[in-house]
């Protein structure tokens, strides 16, 4: 029986998410020849790190790929995806796990994601997008007319998980909205969704969807969630309290309709569709979409995948 060829994989990124991806890949047999750009000290124990190649230097990423000739490139962070890293690498002839820049707008613009969800009949929070400071007051009244629940104010574009304010203080909501608009951005104002939040990663080849294990992360800093939103303070999985059919529900009502809508528009989504969900008293609702593995959830989800599935 012949020996299996050793696969070479390049992972773009430098965080705990990328470390988790490489750690899981390193457990395969035979172990792949792993490379990271730029990587970090923990990753360096498992892979060759190319520290000079940053996550947003697309030219350097292509040059590195042409030098080491990976069989697969995995792009971790959202920013290079939105900037077109996957497109550049595919154009150079490499196999990439990660969506095109056009598909990554699903994360890059919350307003556009809402449009996709509406077209695909995906359940989500009612919302309004404002582009002028003068529109903020009326917008808040529209999504939260009584002011009896928290206000939800989100920067439309990428903000590393820190562009969202959920507060009962109307003035704080207005202050955040003004700051985003005055910086040249748009603001998405949403109705508040009650119930626990869940993250579910769905792997897609542009037409099919396969869910991974659900997880829950903790976004706010400080004890008792007293601080502002962060990129993620921690996470755990599995979720013993979650409905047994949660993953099936999400694929049927959220992920597959979204992937189908993207394909119908000529924008196939290949990679991880991160479904951020709220299990509300009125049923499952989408809080957000991301176009990549979440961090820190990746660190607890990938540990549950059997070797045969890596």
What function would you assign to each model-found segment?
Residues 11, 36-37, 74-75, 96-99, ...:
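General beta-strand structural signal in soluble alpha/beta enzymes
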Residues 64, 139-143, 176:
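CheY-like receiver
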Residues 99-163:
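A conserved helix-loop-beta module that forms one wall/lid of the active-site cleft
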Residues 49-57, 128-132, 167:
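Short acidic-hydrophobic, aromatic-tinged amphipathic segments that line or gate anion-handling sites
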Residues 2-101:
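ATP-binding N-terminal substructure of ATP-dependent carboxylate-amine bond-forming enzymes
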Residues 73, 308-310:
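Conserved small/polar residues in nucleotide/adenosyl-binding loops
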